[in-house]
Amino acid sequence: MKKFTILKGIAAVIPDINIDTDAIIPKQFLKTIHRKGLGKSLFYNERYTEGYNKNLDFILNKDPWSNSSIIIAGENFGCGSSREHAPWALLDFGIQCIISNSFADIFFNNSVKNGLLLIKLNKNEIEILNELAMKKESFSVDLINQKISVKNNEINFNIDPIIKDRLIHGYDDIEITLKNKQLIVDYENNKNKFHIWKNIVNEKQ
């Protein structure tokens, strides 16, 4: 998985609330298990009018936001059904960070596991960033120091230290398991000491 330390780029504002996973990547594009190519169909119903004819009113079809690496989204982003294709499509398009007031839990977990940084900020901070994004200002997202810098503005953000470590080092689930292999082996070898009730049941039998 790609390491995330500092991201510099343009941010696109998509302010609608409750953008669900079907809006992010509609169900007809879920037949593949390949991550590459899904970015073309990201926000399909909003980006295109018919077939793949671009809707020029949609922000990701406008310059410079067509090259965005950051989205500033409305609250409860990623609600709806669980589909890992949603973060796949975002990443394949080039989005590496999403900033919002809140995210759906399942989407949040799927995103973290795929290396997509999700940042929660309060509404006032979101409004400040929205205004700067619409002015086409360049954003810097520093995960190591947990801060967003835009022009003369700096906003700090909180993140779970485990998630932070995972993203900075680019660990996927398999790499995390291998990293903790000895702890897992030790636990398996000693688990009966922790599960006393098993010993009691075995003695009664």
Predicted regions and their residues:
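Cytosolic catalytic domains that perform sulfur/thiol-centered chemistry
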Residues: M1-G74, G78-C79, H85-Q205
